[in-house]
Regions:
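Short gly/ser-rich loop at a beta-strand->alpha-helix junction or flexible surface loop bordering the NTP-binding
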Residues: 1-204, 322-323, 329-334
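Surface segments flanking catalytic/ligand-binding clefts of nucleic-acid enzymes
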Residues: 2-7, 34-37, 181-334
Length: 334
């Protein structure tokens, strides 16, 4: 039988180096530093500073921006444990500054630090630390050694933060959303961002909704351009783009992305990207169901599938065009 020898905890010097000279009271006690010594060292003119409740800076100089973030994270994460660095993530504008977003102030100018913790944690705001609670499982990404919320969540919390501060606060909404999905290190997908903004209830804010709609439309336009190239390669006739289909009596049916009236074939591209609310999703699904009920053959194409298996999408499109719709009801096309 083999035995695993437990790894000894890092010394105070090693811990201070890892956490940029910021430590908690429990970490100090675990290394033999009594409360009396901590109090003495933090007196005026002493070698240490108390930054937040139970969080100390092992230097007499003021904290750097990074040390302020370490203090915020350790304050929110500790739970009476010696190595309490889990259970909290930095989010909002502070996280975006760590990620390097150009549209938000740099770290020295960030005046508040939002920290996300589980809903059941009993923790109060302290100093510049604002506690945000979530009922979802925390997901952390290490950025310069600090636990940060994923980009989509950090963006949503930053927008909530700016919205709560009032209408007079400048909100670089469009710039932040664009940067979230367009940076070379693949910040997040448009779908992830849309889902997070919807979950946070931000899509009812006009500026957020307008910027999100712009992103969604751009994503779909990109995929539609690729589909157009595929249609040309398959030697298919040029389809109608975004026509409004109605019954002879004027009853609305749907607005497919592409439609070949001579074959009764419609194509829908990433239809979920047309929808932010459940009501919009129901409207789109209703149109698709009506087309299928009336005999139109509907081909569904996603950008991910088109990128991964372009030949298979082309084969499906050619087959659909060859077979055509089934007993298609005569429709008016606007």
């Amino acid at each position: 039988m083999s035995y695993r020898i437990p790894t000894p905890p890092p010394s105070l010097e090693e811990l201070a180096k890892r956490q940029q000279n910021v430590v908690t009271a429990s970490q100090l006690r675990a290394r033999g530093v009594p409360a009396r010594v901590i109090t003495e060292h933090c007196r005026r003119g002493g070698p240490w500073r108390r930054l937040l409740p139970r969080v100390y800076l092992l230097q007499s100089d003021g904290p750097t921006p990074e040390q302020r973030l370490w203090a915020a994270l350790l304050y929110a994460a500790q739970n009476g444990r010696e190595e309490g660095r889990e259970g909290a993530v930095i989010t909002g504008a502070a996280a975006l500054a760590l990620y390097g977003f150009a549209a938000v102030p740099r770290l020295p100018a960030v005046t508040g630090v939002d920290v996300l913790v589980p809903r059941q944690r009993r923790l109060k705001d302290a100093g510049e630390v604002r506690i945000r609670r979530t009922g979802r499982e925390l997901v952390a990404r290490s950025v310069h050694g600090l636990a940060c919320a994923p980009v989509a969540r950090a963006v949503a919390d930053a927008l909530c933060e700016w919205t709560e501060e009032g209408a007079g606060v400048p909100m670089p909404v469009r710039e932040v959303l664009r940067e979230a999905v367009s940076r070379p290190d693949s910040r997040c997908t448009v779908r992830e961002l849309a889902a997070e903004l919807t979950e946070s209830g931000l899509t009812g804010e006009p500026r957020v909704r307008a910027a999100l709609d712009e992103l969604l439309a751009g994503e779909r336009d990109f995929v539609l351009d690729r589909v157009g190239e595929l249609v040309d390669e398959c030697l298919l006739p040029v389809p109608l783009a975004g026509p409004e289909l109605r019954m002879r009596g004027g009853t609305f049916i749907a607005v497919p992305d592409l439609y070949w009236p001579e074959r009764g074939v419609a194509l829908e591209v990433d239809s979920d990207l047309r929808c932010v609310s459940e009501g919009e999703a129901a409207w789109v699904r209703g149109g698709q169901h009506r087309m299928e009920y009336l005999g139109i053959r509907v081909v569904y194409v996603s950008g991910a599938r088109l990128a991964a298996d372009r030949d298979a999408v082309g084969a499906e499109l050619r087959e659909a065009f060859q077979v055509g719709g089934t007993d298609v009801v005569e429709l008016m096309v606007d």
